């Protein structure tokens, strides 16, 4: 039996989608959560000096998107055709572009910056980025007959976006109660039985 170990901090962050994919597929894995001290000790042993790290029977692999894409493909969450797989990748890459603007806010929060600085980042960087990003998502959902972002089945793109919407809500950067389309999409995904089970028992973290 293959042994999987996923190493990351005690946060959703860059490892959460991989964790969700393991649970959605019903595949056992070791969810190793490390602190900064442990990371400093292990860093020299990691391929790129970064986490998350997926260890498969002792072989290490890095890069969060590569890991999640591998698991999605292996467990059947990439769509039913090559074109659907391409579309799922497109959605995830659009999310990654958006996250670059969001990263500045996360760093400011974790660094303890003043509320004034956080407010400036929200107004000047985050809000315009959120508007463009959510418009892109809603354009896809408006054309969807299934309620999913890609095809007629849940894909890893749905997991990525639903998790990100949760982060935006928690950071008070998205008023989803006034956005019917995104609210219905997020609820559809997080109410998926196996995912709902994981969300109920995972450790509570801010990001």
From Swiss-Prot:
> What SUPFAM superfamilies does the record point to?
GST C-terminal domain-like (SSF47616), Thioredoxin-like (SSF52833)
One term of GO molecular function: glutathione transferase activity
The reaction(s) annotated as catalysed by this protein in its Swiss-Prot or TrEMBL entry are:
RX + glutathione = an S-substituted glutathione + a halide anion + H(+)
Domain named GST C-terminal: residues: 81-207
Q: Does the keyword Transmembrane helix apply?
A: no
EC number(s)?
2.5.1.18
Task: Please state what class of enzyme this protein is.
Answer: transferase
Assigned keywords, A-Z: Transferase
User: Belongs to which family?
Assistant: Belongs to the GST superfamily. Sigma family.
- Please identify the protein, giving its name as recorded: Glutathione S-transferase 3
- Please name the source species: Caenorhabditis elegans
Lineage of producing organism: Eukaryota, Metazoa, Ecdysozoa, Nematoda, Chromadorea
């Amino acid at each position: 039996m293959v042994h999987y170990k996923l190493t990351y901090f005690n946060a959703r962050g860059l490892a959460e989608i991989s964790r969700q994919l393991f649970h959605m597929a019903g595949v056992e894995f070791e969810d190793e959560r490390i602190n900064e001290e442990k990371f400093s000790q292990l860093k020299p042993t990691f391929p790129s000096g970064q986490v998350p790290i997926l260890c498969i029977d002792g072989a290490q692999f890095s890069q969060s998107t590569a890991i999640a894409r591998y698991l999605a493909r292996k467990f059947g969450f990439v769509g039913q055709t090559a074109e659907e797989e391409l579309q799922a990748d497109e959605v995830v890459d659009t999310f990654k572009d958006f996250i670059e603007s969001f990263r500045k806010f996360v760093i400011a929060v974790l660094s303890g910056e003043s509320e004034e600085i956080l407010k400036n980042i929200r107004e000047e960087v985050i809000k315009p980025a959120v508007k463009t990003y959510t418009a892109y998502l809603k354009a896809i959902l408006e054309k969807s007959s299934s309620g999913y972002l890609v095809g007629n089945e849940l894909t890893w793109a749905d997991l990525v976006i639903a998790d990100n919407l949760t982060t935006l809500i928690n950071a008070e950067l998205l008023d989803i109660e006034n956005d019917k389309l995104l609210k219905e999409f997020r609820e559809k995904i997080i109410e998926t039985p196996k995912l709902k089970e994981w969300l109920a028992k995972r450790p509570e973290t801010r990001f």
